[in-house]
Swiss-Prot record:
Catalytic activity field: ATP + H2O = ADP + phosphate + H(+)
Lineage: Eukaryota, Metazoa, Chordata, Craniata, Vertebrata
Organism the protein comes from: Bos taurus (Bovine)
Domain comment quoted from the record: The PIP-box (PCNA interacting peptide) motif mediates the interaction with PCNA and localization to replication foci.
Region listing for Disordered, in residue ranges: 978-1018, 1140-1172
Enzyme class at the top of the EC tree: isomerase
Tissues expressed in: Highly expressed in adult testis, liver and ovary.
Sequence motif Nuclear localization signal, location on chain: 150-166, 874-880
GO MF terms held by the record: 4 iron, 4 sulfur cluster binding; ATP binding; ATP hydrolysis activity; DNA binding; DNA helicase activity; DNA polymerase binding; metal ion binding
Compartments, record wording: Nucleus
Residue positions of motif PIP-box: 1172-1179
Oligomer and partners: Interacts with TERF1. Interacts (via PIP-box) with PCNA; the interaction is direct and essential for suppressing telomere fragility. Interacts with MMS19; the interaction mediates the association of RTEL1 with the cytosolic iron-sulfur protein assembly (CIA) complex.
Protein name: Regulator of telomere elongation helicase 1
């Protein structure tokens, strides 16, 4: 990596930096060396994150070297280097600034708005040569892995339940943190949030407290910036800012976050819910106290409940809340009910009436914390503690600064400077049911009032940060313009400022102001014109014409959701949208967060489709799509801004903000360091526009066009608010025709001169070229661990080779891409057990290669019955291996063909909306590997209609190998049938041309060997059937079976599994015998047992269901097939206890039908015959196996006629 020296510091950069990047890093180093604050703007795509990381970490390493130099000099005492001064070891650091020891080297705190942005930053860090000790802080909601805590619905309930478990040492994940947190695997690598959770799950330790441990020794700490700006969060996470370097990335949001973190709205609903909870706890505690008087032994139980509050304490809390409610209701509003505004200091008068003061706040907070922690984790009515938690937050905000000796003066003055109190009628909530106790106030019957305490100065939070002892504060973003006003708002000095140019050239960006549409109508988003038919019609025509000349993805930003929705409604009514979607389909940003990622993925997929002409994404300024998303290259070749997104002018908070700024400016005089209210109002719109413009150019080789569709952009003062890198390219057009001409010319030139963007990973599909099917032999036997893997032997479970031919069919390849993984380009044994399947690898002729649709898509009901294999194949007759061109191989004979046919079947069965949901679910599964989320999306599509059950079962072939068992169980619950029947496993039939291999991997030398001979010659029941592990027997082997008992210690993990047909038969019997209700209870208990491994719980349910009638007892015994190995012995004993001594406990067949003894087997077997008979259905001497397989072709257990292949493929199922 190139090394460059800036301000005396050597920076390791991944590549040769651009001039603007060197300038940016120089400014960062200037801030660090001079211990001053800085505001640095650098457009998106200029690599500011990489520059920040490399420059700060290089400076920190330089400082570490200086500490080493000081230690060497001190140790040498000037004898070794008498002529060398300390400064010569590090010329960028004055001698007085060198820390005394390594622990004094400043930590770096890197903050961004969201964890997803932090994940991108950590990914950038991995691309550098620096390997600092890293810590990322997150909430319990993101990091906690304790099942009980994760179930809590609200974050504050998770916090209190977690604290309670930690205090009582009842969380085993937390108990492991101290012991395991120093392990090299956890302390050394660079871990993000997802890595922490994975490592915590793997090592059984708490990721949340692990991150807090790592924080102590970390060189750089990543966190969302509300952890820094909110004093409550700083205290909760134990963040010490003294002497640290704090970096705010994406700092254009800091102003809003500072104000929101220090503000609150207290509604009547909040107060009512707080009173309800206190009422219920008070009633509960009163009953406990009465019981304790009558029965003293109850007092011990009360003491153990964990709540140290007496009923009198709870009554005081209730009185405080009622007085606060009364004080708020007593405030008189003007006749028009517009609300009343008071100075910020009024909040202390209001709270004092409720006896909430600096002196009492500590006791009140302690009582509320105890109450919430007491209720944490409790079910039913005691889960609604959000109101209590909000009251805690409110008291901490109001009394955020501790006054010396209880003197409220400083805090009152601060509140007067930065806050306003606003009280208005509650329009959003209605009062809950009227409380009818004697404490109710008459005010409860009046309309409720909302108490708002709003901070209007982001400088309030920033000054508090500086007071914590921060060494250097750096704010950076791609859109901070206008810079002067931004620094004024922060109200702290920023000596270092930078407004960087972009790294792109002039021919990569086109910016045009369009004041009029094609019909000559003025374009305006002003309040009085934005909903007029003339304006909406003209805007629709503009969008239609621009979509013709902008290739690929086009983004359209509206000022607000109502404007976007009204525009869409107008265009739909007049057929605009239908005409648009002929060229580019429309995707609309949803209001909710839930569906946003789905819409984005669908947009990306549509743009990336090979034959697609692109797509249009309609979004909102300041919305979810306006920042942090990747619209690079073809995803965003054009951005249309349809208006200036001013805040709502009549909103009380906006009016008060403007009024507050005007007051501050008037008080500071002519040269005051404050914005006017009007300037701030205009700046809010400009910042939102600049953020939207930043979506179009994302890197050095990107290009795109910006369309500003509002006549007000033609004004010079509005254009002056645009980013500095955009302003030189802006051109105002009088004629719309000239816009289309220039844009078309711009894209023609750009497409010729700019390099093609790197292609995204395409889904594998079927090619059209010729070629031959390669057949290669394995260089040697499979490793033991690999040979034990099921997907090595079963082709349908095998992950697909990345070099396979591709096609343009995106739907057909959608399922296949989930299974991709680089593997060796070799054909592997296709059978489940190599000992029984060697000769089955002989390839079929070309006539056998076409799979029926049913087999290709894994859906048995789609087409006709499966055709029979030729008789000569069944008899094991030799066949020739023919190599044919790939053009002769039907698509259905490949994984891609199966996927294509399956997708076609799904598309025919579902509506377009449902099919879109289905494809999106697959993409999410590919990226997240979350089977539960996939099932939640697929269940409503397929499970409700019995005709679609086969499609859900057919999806089994595309589920990743480690999820197949879980998906099998889900299918069983949803459809009543399993989905792993032999044809869906993709067994050896019709697998293409392969050569038969012997156990050493060489080509089979005896061409005349028949199927039966090959099987019987190599079969040894102890060594080769599942590597000698027990199958149906769950207990110890009989003493006489010495050959097999040698392997009893190496039981396969899935050896206790039953065949799906056995499970289906049992569940069908349960449904028939116990009815729907009993069946549902048993399934629920079984699912819970799988998750928590609680044997007592599941047995209690099953025993209650199956022991009411004597005839139901066999169901209890057969339930043993689901019992895990370490519970088998207890289950057998329980069956004996419940059934009586005369009833035999379920044996290895888990209560299934008894296997008939084999009259053929006369081989001597030491030990009692009774014990041997329990496993006689599976263990046979070689002679008996040979006779059964070669002559009778019957199952050795049930004597049913069958082919040898079926035996190999279904793991010897029990007879039905």
């Amino acid at each position: 990596m190139p090394k460059i020296t800036l301000k005396g510091v050597t920076v390791d950069f991944p590549f040769q930096p651009y001039k603007c990047q060197e300038e940016y890093m120089s400014k960062v180093l200037e801030c660090l060396q001079e211990k001053v604050n800085g505001i640095l703007e650098s457009p998106t795509g200029t690599g500011k994150t990489l520059c920040l990381l490399c420059s700060t970490l290089a400076w920190r390493e330089h400082l570490r070297d200086a500490v080493s130099a000081r230690r060497i000099a001190e140790r040498a005492s000037g004898e070794l280097f008498p002529d060398r001064t300390l400064a010569s070891w590090g010329n960028a650091i004055p001698e007085g600034d060198v820390p005394a020891c390594y622990t004094d080297i400043p930590k770096i705190i890197y903050a961004s708005r969201t964890h997803s942005q932090l994940t991108q930053v950590i990914s950038e860090l991995r691309n550098t040569s620096y390997r600092p000790r890293v810590c990322v802080l997150g909430s319990r909601e993101q990091l906690c892995i304790h099942p009980e805590v994760k179930k809590q619905e609200s974050n504050h309930m998770q916090v209190h339940l977690c604290r309670r478990k930690v205090a009582s040492r009842s969380c085993h994940f937390y108990n492991n943190v101290e012991e395991k947190s120093l392990e090299q695997e956890l302390a050394t690598p660079i871990l993000d949030i997802e890595d922490l959770v994975r490592s915590g799950t793997k090592h059984k330790l708490c990721p949340y407290y692990l991150s807090r441990n790592l924080k102590q020794q970390a060189d750089i700490i990543f966190m969302p910036y509300n952890y820094l700006l909110d004093a409550k969060s700083r205290r909760a996470h134990g963040i010490d800012l003294k002497g640290t370097v704090v970096i705010f990335d994406e700092a254009h949001n800091v102003e809003k976050m500072c104000e929101e973190a220090a503000s609150f709205d207290l509604t009547p609903h909040d107060v009512a819910s707080e009173l309800d909870v206190i009422d219920r706890v008070l009633e509960e505690r009163t009953k406990v106290a009465q019981q304790a008087e009558l029965h003293p032994e109850f007092s011990a139980d009360s003491a153990r409940s964990g709540l140290n509050l007496e009923p009198e304490d709870l009554a005081k809390l209730k009185m405080i809340l009622l007085r606060l409610e009364g004080a708020i209701d007593a405030v008189e509003l003007p006749g028009d009910n517009s609300g009343v505004t008071k100075p910020g200091s009024y909040i202390f008068e209001l709270f004092a009436e409720a006896q909430i003061t600096f002196q009492t706040k500590g006791c009140i907070l302690d009582s509320l914390d105890q109450l919430i922690q007491h209720l944490a984790g409790r079910a039913g009515l005691f889960t609604n503690t959000a109101g209590l938690q909000k009251l805690v937050d409110i008291i901490q905000i109001v009394f955020s600064v501790d006054s010396a000796e209880g003197d409220p003066g400083p805090m009152v003055g601060l509140a007067s400077q930065s806050y306003k109190v606003h009280i208005h009628l509650d329009a959003g909530h209605r009062r809950t049911a009227q409380r009818s106790d004697v404490w109710n106030t008459t005010a409860a019957r009046k309309p409720g009032k909302v108490l708002s305490y709003w901070c209007f100065s982001p400088g309030h939070s920033m000054r508090e940060l500086v007071r914590q002892g921060v060494r250097t504060l750096i704010l950076t973003s791609g859109t901070l313009a206008p810079m002067a006003s931004f620094s004024l708002e922060m109200q702290i000095p920023f000596p270092v400022c930078l407004e960087n140019p972009h790294v792109i050239n002039q021919h990569q960006i086109w910016v045009g102001v369009i004041p009029k549409g094609p019909d000559g109508a003025q374009l305006s988003s002003a309040f009085d014109r934005r909903f007029s038919d003339e304006c909406l019609s003209s805007l629709g025509k503009v969008l239609s014409n621009i979509s013709r000349v902008v290739p690929h993805g086009l983004l359209v930003f509206f000022p607000s959701y109502p404007v976007m929705e009204k525009s869409l409604e107008f265009w739909r009514a007049r057929d605009f949208t239908r005409k648009l979607e002929v060229r580019k389909p429309l995707f609309v940003e949803p209001r909710s967060k839930g569906g946003f990622s789905e819409v984005m993925e669908a947009f990306y997929a549509r743009v990336a489709a090979p034959e697609s002409s692109g797509a249009i994404f309609l979004a909102v300024c300041r919305g979810k799509a306006s920042e942090g998303l990747d619209f690079a290259d073809v995803n965003g070749r054009g951005v249309i801004v349809t208006g200036l997104p001013y805040p709502p002018r009549m909103d009380p908070r906006v009016l008060l903000k403007m009024q507050f700024l005007d007051e501050m400016k008037a008080q500071s005089g002519a040269g005051g360091q404050f914005l006017s209210g009007h300037d701030w109002y205009r700046q809010q719109a400009s910042r939102a526009v600049n953020q939207a413009i930043g979506r179009v150019i994302r890197h050095r080789h990107d290009y795109g066009a910006v369309f500003l569709c509002d006549h007000r952009f033609a004004h010079a003062d509005t254009r002056a608010q645009l980013p500095s890198w955009v302003r030189p390219h802006v051109k105002v057009y009088d004629s719309f025709g000239h816009v289309i001409r220039d844009v078309a010319q711009f894209f023609r030139v750009a497409q010729k001169t700019m390099p093609e963007p790197a292609p995204r990973a395409a889904a594998p599909s079927l090619g059209e070229g010729g070629g031959i099917v390669s057949v290669s032999v394995s260089p040697g036997p499979l490793p033991t661990r690999k040979a034990m893997s099921l997907d090595v032997h079963v082709p349908s479970l095998r992950q697909r080779h990345t070099g396979s031919p591709v096609t343009k069919d995106t739907e057909g390849s959608l399922c296949v891409e989930y299974e991709q993984e680089p593997v060796r380009a070799q054909r592997r044994p296709a059978g489940l057990l190599a000992a029984l399947g060697h000769n089955e690898q002989l390839a079929e002729g070309p006539g056998d290669e076409a799979l029926p649709v049913e087999e290709a898509c894994g859906c048995p009901t789609l087409l006709g019955p499966r055709e029979k294999r030729p008789a000569e194949e069944q008899r094991g007759r030799r066949r020739k291996v023919r190599l044919v061109g790939s053009s002769e191989v039907p698509a259905a004979s490949t994984d891609t063909g199966r996927a294509k046919l399956f997708m076609v079947a799904v598309k025919q069965a579902l509506s377009q909306a449902s099919f879109d949901t289905f494809t999106q679910a697959l993409r999410d599964y590919k990226s997240s590997d979350d089977l539960e989320a996939l099932v939640a999306r697929l269940s409503p599509l397929f499970a409700e209609d019995p005709k679609k059950h086969s499609l859900l079962q057919g999806f089994y072939q595309f589920v990743r190998p480690h999820h197949k068992q879980q998906f099998e169980e889900v299918c069983l619950q949803l459809t009543g049938q399993g989905c792993s029947s032999p044809h869906k496993h993709g067994h050896p039939q019709r697998q293409g041309a392969q050569l038969a291999l012997d156990s050493s991997g060489r080509k089979e030398s005896d061409p005349k060997l028949t199927v039966s001979q090959g099987a019987t010659r190599q079969l040894d029941p102890c060594e080769q059937l599942n590597q000698g592990r027990p199958h149906l027997a769950s207990g110890p082997f009989p003493a006489g079976d010495l050959n097999c008992s040698l392997h009893k210690g190496s039981r396969a993990p899935g050896a206790e599994k039953q065949h799906p047909s056995t499970v289906s038969a049992y569940l069908a019997d349960v449904r028939r015998t116990l009815g729907a209700a009993g069946y549902s209870q048993l399934l629920t208990a079984l699912t819970t047992y799988k998750q928590d491994d609680d044997f007592e719980k599941v047995v209690a349910v099953v025993a209650a269901l199956t022991t009411e009638k004597p005839e139901d007892l066999p169901l209890l015994q057969r339930f043993g097939m689901f019992v895990r190995p370490h519970h088998k012995q207890r289950f057998r004993q329980m069956c004996v206890d419940l059934s009586g001594p005369g009833t035999q406990a379920p044996g290895p067949q888990e209560g299934g039908p008894a296997m008939p003894s084999d009259p053929v087997c006369e081989a001597p077997s030491p030990g009692p015959r009774k014990t041997q008979s329990k496993i006689s259905s599976f263990l046979r001497c070689q002679a008996c196996w040979r006779q059964h397989l070669q002559v009778s072709r019957k199952c050795p257990g049930c004597c049913a006629a069958t082919r040898k292949q079926t035996l190999a493929q279904v793991f010897w199922p029990e007879p039905q």
